[in-house]
């Protein structure tokens, strides 16, 4: 019988039950009446309780001051109540207790309509915390931060009192490896600085619909191997000390809505600084607006050479294919290209709209490009045939060309410069 098992094993089993089922185990026996209170993991959702007082009462029992056992994981979801939501004392006491019980994984998500909770000061000096996820709360202006074991931080719609607060919070995590920032900010912030000697993965997702934010982001993380940016607010990005094997995923229009010559000219310094900071990336994913912006920039200034890049994933509008050779010219050692074209299936392009330039054959096509994967929604367009012909006729060592539809039987009649090339229909 399960009751004959030792308490630690029973607690482990109970930790996999939903909270509403967990509480009902109290009626099984006298021994089980308080056993659930000693679980090492708890997921507490205010929606499971009839009112605010019942929710707080339940949490207070679990975080009793006499508790001596450790708490490994605590997930807390707080949704708005009409009464009591503006009193954060219960949240402070729970997190204080969790810190004392050597919490390792903490996830707090608050959705009250009129109140933003501040995280208690005890959180900033938790010596055992390994994983932290915060959603719709405020980081306090803590003068002292010490999080020696924290490896993962996810921040969603988190507010901070000043721009130095988040910088200090991140830089005081000596073993931090992963940081995700989603819609965080401060209406008075100008520059967001992310400085870390241990950070390996960084994702920034900030859109105008989320909140007002800074105009500049500075990233200095010498061990960074993955950087994802989806930001249509910030006007300037400075990336320092990026690893030579880093992967980059960017959707970054530098705060521009239009890409006319005057608008792009106003961002030439910002684009130049950003491109110089990412020269060592080996794997780049670039999205529609960013590709268009960089190509518009190339008409004003020469693109730098991405000598370390071996893989490129580009999503672009078919109208922008004319810039592809220019962009590829800046990737002399490219081995793999994934090309995704988006647009209206009924679009027809004039001869001027798609120019691959018979005289321009990028260096990578002659010396390094081995794999091309074309994913395009258009059916039977002459322009698509031009695109495929361009790669088949000019890629000297191409090994495989992959297409996502089966209407290109004419491709077999196109002469190939590479004798090793395969044409694969998906």
From Swiss-Prot:
Q: Which cysteines are joined by disulfide bonds?
A: none
- According to the lineage, what is the superkingdom? Eukaryota
Q: Name one Pfam family in it.
A: F-box
What positions belong to coiled-coil segments? none
- All copies of domain FBD, residue ranges: 353-405
Chain ranges of the F-box domain: 1-45
The protein here is known as Putative FBD-associated F-box protein At5g53635
Organism, scientific name: Arabidopsis thaliana (Mouse-ear cress)
């Amino acid at each position: 019988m399960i009751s004959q098992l030792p308490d630690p094993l029973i607690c482990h089993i109970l930790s996999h039950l939903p909270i509403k089922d967990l509480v009902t185990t109290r009626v099984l026996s006298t021994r089980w009446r308080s056993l659930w209170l000693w679980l090492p993991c708890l997921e507490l959702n205010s929606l499971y309780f009839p009112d605010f007082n019942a929710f707080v009462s339940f949490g207070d029992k679990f975080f009793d001051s006499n508790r001596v056992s450790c708490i490994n994981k605590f997930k807390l979801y707080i949704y708005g109540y009409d009464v009591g939501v503006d009193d954060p004392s219960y949240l402070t006491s729970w997190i204080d207790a969790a810190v004392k019980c050597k919490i390792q994984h903490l996830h707090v998500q608050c959705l009250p309509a009129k109140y933003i909770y501040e995280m208690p000061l005890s959180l900033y000096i938790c010596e055992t915390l390994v994983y932290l996820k915060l959603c719709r709360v405020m980081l306090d202006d803590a003068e002292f931060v010490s999080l020696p074991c924290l490896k993962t931080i996810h921040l969603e719609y988190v507010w901070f009192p000043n721009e130095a607060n988040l910088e200090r919070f991140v830089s005081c995590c000596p073993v931090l490896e992963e940081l995700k920032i989603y819609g965080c900010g401060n209406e008075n912030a100008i520059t967001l600085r992310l400085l870390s000697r241990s950070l390996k993965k960084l994702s920034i997702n900030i859109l105008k619909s989320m909140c007002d934010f800074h105009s500049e982001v500075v990233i200095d993380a010498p061990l960074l191997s993955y950087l994802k940016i989806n930001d249509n607010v910030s006007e300037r990005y400075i990336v320092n000390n990026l690893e030579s094997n880093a992967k980059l995923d960017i959707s970054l229009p530098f705060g521009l809505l239009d890409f006319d010559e005057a608008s792009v000219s106003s961002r030439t310094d910002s684009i130049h600084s950003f491109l110089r900071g990412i020269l060592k990336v080996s794997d780049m994913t670039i999205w529609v607006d960013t590709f268009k912006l960089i190509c518009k920039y190339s008409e004003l200034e020469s693109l730098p050479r991405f000598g370390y890049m071996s893989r490129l994933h580009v999503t672009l509008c078919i109208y922008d294919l004319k810039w592809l050779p220019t962009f590829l010219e800046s990737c002399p050692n490219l081995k793999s290209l994934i090309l995704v074209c988006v647009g209206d299936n009924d679009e027809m392009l004039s001869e001027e709209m798609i120019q691959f330039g018979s005289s321009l054959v990028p260096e990578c096509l002659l010396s390094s490009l081995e794999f091309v994967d074309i994913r395009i929604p258009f059916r039977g367009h002459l322009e698509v045939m031009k695109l495929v012909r361009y790669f088949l006729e000019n890629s000297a060592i191409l090994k495989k060309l992959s297409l996502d539809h089966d209407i290109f039987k004419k491709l077999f009649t196109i002469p190939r410069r590479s004798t090793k090339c395969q044409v694969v229909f998906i």
